[in-house]
Amino acid sequence: MIDKQFEKEEFKKSVKENVKFLYRKTLEEATQEQIFQAVSYTVKDVIIDNWLKSQKAYEKQDPKIVYYMSMEFLMGRALGNNLINLGAYGEVKEALEELGLDINCIEDQEPDPALGNGGLGRLAACFLDSLATLNY
């Protein structure tokens, strides 16, 4: 994962705790949707840590900012994309398998936001991905 070392045991513990505190259930009692939410919250925690570091770096540098306005954004599903961007997809897949969970079944629980209906939405998403990849 970016900046934050991936700890498989910590990840598994966090997923179990999220199921427990969000739904008052054990992992074995949780539905696939609840497990998806618990995994998403765990990934969100890592993203937030990295986001805060980025924000502090931007405040120090005072860089130029680009704004892109679009009524459509076809970003697709976020969980798998975020795991890939964090460089942790394989490790998370392995951790989930150790918990008896299939990452593909978990990813299938996420609805596609479909914020648009065509080329402009896909173009907006490509612009965002490209700028992020180029560290803008």
Please provide the spans of the model-predicted regions.
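A conserved ligand/cofactor-binding region detector
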Residues: 1-136
